[in-house]
């Protein structure tokens, strides 16, 4: 509701932003040249609400203009279209991360994607329900988490414990995080922490609490739907 939040936002607008982002990132990927794999990271509050109550997993009411069944089908179709588009450029890998807005329905979606793409040799969908995920490429170790459940000061230790072998054979380590609806980079214990913003607009709760963000997110390109590009000629 524009007069309440200062921004007009509905499902049509949000879907348009998502599709524009996919096109923009595909253009960026093509500029890179030899990309070996695309990590499609989308489960950071993708569906925003978690089920029939139209609230977050923890029960905070959310604004939505769809019934929960419509929301799931709409979001799922967006994800399928995105993967189909990305796989034209490089093999795609996607996985689950636990987030606080739609922890359950995000997992249902990753399972549906696994079934949908089960016969695709260039699409890998992991249904591991672990709340965090790690990927190693050469001497780079990437950690993915929502950063709602995990305390920031504990994340460096979690990476060392959960990825003992990969920790010992890598030089560069990063966490790609979400949750705070802002873009921030910080180094903690030799690990780079990157918080990525969102392409979503303002809703009642975020506006009431004063969480106002820049309108230039689509221009910058780094968002919750995060693409980690693994280049075969990249030693970082």
Question: What positions do the PLM features span?
Answer:
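Intrinsic low-complexity, intrinsically disordered segments enriched in polar/basic residues
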Residues: 2-4, 234
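Active-site metal-binding loops of divalent metal-dependent hydrolases
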Residues: 1, 44-47, 99-101, 147-148, ...
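Core catalytic region of metal-dependent phosphoesterases/phosphodiesterases
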Residues: 5-123
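A broad, low-specificity signal for short, low-complexity segments enriched in glycine/proline
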Residues: 3, 56-57, 103-104, 154-157, ...
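Conserved beta-sheet core of the metallophosphoesterase superfamily
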Residues: 113-124, 128-129, 136-236
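Intrinsic disorder and flexible coil segments
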Residues: 41-44, 50, 67, 73, ...
